[in-house]
C-alpha cells in the first residue's frame, strides 16, 4: 500500500515541474535534479519533521533544496501571511481563467509556485505518515507478537481513526495482559452469585421464583413449628439420632440466613406511588422494618448454650418468630390460584390439626409430670405415645364426653384450661370454616337467588311454561359459560386502563378480523372495545327480523347464526360463524336505508357483541378521519346492496320462448284509459285543436 502511494506521489512532481517551467525555465532546470536526489535520500532516511524554509534560503543553499520539494522529509508549518498569499494567488488564477488578466511580476510568480508545492508536499507527507501508522497498528493487532514494535499515535492520528487516547491505552494494556499474563482473573463468589442468580430487585407479586423460595422458607418454618414441641416433650431425640436432628436444624438455619441476607433486602416496595428498585433504598427499607427485627430475633444463636446445658430443643424456640414469611406465602399463593377457597379450607384444617398437635404434646408433658400411669386421667404408657395423646386432645377440644375425671388439683386446673381454650378455639375455627365455604359459594348463591326471583315473577303473571323454560335455559347456560350474569357490572369499579386491558385480551382478536374497521384509528378501536356489550341467544332466537329498523351492529363472538330468505322466509341463505359481522349497513346508513333486509336466527347457542348506532356516532365525533373512512365503506356497501336488489333473478325453464315484456313508454301511459286501451276520441280532439289554432 505504501509503495503504490509513493508511485502516486512521484507522479505529482512532473506536474509541478511543468508549472515551474512555464513560470521560470531556469528555476525548473535547477529544481529537477534536486527533487530526484531528495526522493532517493528520503527512501533511506526515516520519517521526521522539519520546519519550512523560505524561498530565499532555498536559492542561497542549493543542498537544502532537496528537503524543500521532498514528499517524505517535509512537514509544513506555514505562517498566516503565507496562507493569505495562497488565497490571493488562487483568486488571481480564477480571474485569469475567466479572461481578466492582471500584470504579475516574475518574483511573485515564483514565490506563489513555491508555496503551492510546500502545501502539497505537507498534506501528502501527513497522509503517508498516518497511513504508515495505521498499517502498523493493524498489523500489530492481527499478529499479536510479543516483540512487535509499538506505534505511538499522535493526537491527529487518534482523531482520524476515531479512537480516543484513553481507549487506545486501554486496548494496549489489555493486549499486554493477554500476552504476558497467564493467571485467570478470580471473580468473588458473592459477585458471581449476584450476576448469575440474584437480580438487583425482586417483584414479590409477579416473580414466581420468589414464590418458590417462600415455599422453601415455609417448609423450614413448619419443620420448626411442628417438630420442636415433639422433640421437647416426647423421647424421640436420642443420642443415636442426635446428629441427624442437628444437621436438619443447620439446613433450616441456612435457609433462614439466606432469606435475611440475599432475598429480603431485594424486595421492591412502593413509596409515594413510585416503585423503588434502588439497591440501597431496598436494603434501608428492609432494615428499618419490623419484619427485619423478627427475622433477626428468629436467628439468634442460642444453640451456643448446648455447651453448658447439652442439646436441648428449647434453645431453638425462637425459630418460630419467623411467621411473617409463612403468612406472606399464603397471601401470594391465594392471589394466583384459580380457586383460592380450596386452599383456604386446607389452611384452616391445618390450623386445627396444629392446635390438636400442641394439645397432645402438652397432655403428654402433664402425664410425664404427674407420672405415667399414676392415675386414670394421665397417659397409661400403653400403645403409641403420640397417637394416644392426640386422640385424647381431639376428644377434649371437641368437648366429647366419656373422659376420665381428673384426680389431683393440677389435673383439675389443667382440664379446666383445656376445656375453656378448646371451646373458644374450636368455635373460632368452625366459624372461619363457615366463612370460607360461604365465600366460595357466594356467586352460586347469588345466581340461585336471581333465578328464584325471576321464576317467582313469571309465576305471578302466569307466563307460559314454554317461555319459562327458555328463560331457565338462558340463565343456566349463561351461568355455566361465564359464571356471571352481567359482565359490565363486574368491571365497573376498575379503572378505565384496566378495563381496556381486559377488553383487549378478550375481544381484540375478534375486532381485528372485522373488515369494516380495518384502517381505522387504533384508539377508536379501543373505545369501541369498551362500549361493546355481550348478549347470549338461545337456539332459534331471532337476532333481527326483516323490515325492522336497525339500530345495532352484531359481531359473532361464539356460535353461529343463519340468514334466512326465500319466498317463505325459511330458506337458509348463508351461515355466519365466529368473527363475522352483520347489521353494519343499517348502522351506517342514513335516512330510510336502515331497514333490516333479512331475518337472522341463532343456530345453537350464540354469543354476540352488540354496538348500537348512538354509541358509534358518539365515538366517531372524536375521530373524523375514521368517520370519513367508514362513510366511504358504507357507500360501497350500499351500492353493492342496490346492485343485488336491482338484479333480475333468472327464470326457471325455457325463458327464451317467453321473453319478458318491455316497459310501456311514458307518453303512451298518459293516453291510456282506465281500461288500458288508447282513447281514439281523445286523439281526434287533440288533432282538431291543432288544426283550428293553425
Swiss-Prot record:
Annotated family: Belongs to the cyclic nucleotide-gated cation channel (TC 1.A.1.5) family. CNGB3 subfamily.
Any one Gene Ontology molecular-function term assigned to this protein's record: intracellularly cAMP-activated cation channel activity
GO cellular component: photoreceptor outer segment; plasma membrane; transmembrane transporter complex
Natural source organism: Mus musculus
Site positions (Occludes the pore below the central gate): 434
Domain of life: Eukaryota
Stated role: Pore-forming subunit of the cone cyclic nucleotide-gated channel. Mediates cone photoresponses at bright light converting transient changes in intracellular cGMP levels into electrical signals. In the dark, cGMP levels are high and keep the channel open enabling a steady inward current carried by Na(+) and Ca(2+) ions that leads to membrane depolarization and neurotransmitter release from synaptic terminals.
Quaternary organization: Forms heterotetrameric channels composed of CNGA3 and CNGB3 subunits with 3:1 stoichiometry.
Gene from which the chain derives: Cngb3
Site (Central gate): 426, 430
Record-linked Gene3D superfamilies: 1.10.287.70, Helix hairpin bin (1.10.287.630), Jelly Rolls (2.60.120.10)
Keyword Transcription regulation recorded: no
Domains: entry comment: The cyclic nucleotide-binding domain (CNBD) comprises three helices and a beta-roll of eight beta-strands from CNGA3 and CNGB3 subunits. Upon cNMP binding transmits the conformational changes to the C-linker domain of the S6 helix to open the ion conduction pathway.
Keywords, sorted A to Z: Cell membrane, cGMP, cGMP-binding, Ion channel, Ion transport, Ligand-gated ion channel, Membrane, Nucleotide-binding, Sensory transduction, Transmembrane, Transmembrane helix, Transport, Vision
Alphabetical list of Pfam families matching this protein: cNMP_binding, Ion_trans
Extracellular side: 235-241, 310-312, 364-385
Residue ranges of the region described as Selectivity filter: 399-402
Transmembrane segments: 211-234, 242-262, 292-309, 313-327, 341-363, 386-412, 413-437
Catalyzed chemical reaction(s): Ca(2+)(in) = Ca(2+)(out); Na(+)(in) = Na(+)(out); K(+)(in) = K(+)(out); NH4(+)(in) = NH4(+)(out)
Protein name (database record): Cyclic nucleotide-gated channel beta-3
Primary localization class, coarse: membrane
Region described as Ion conduction pathway: 340-439
Biological process, per Gene Ontology: visual perception
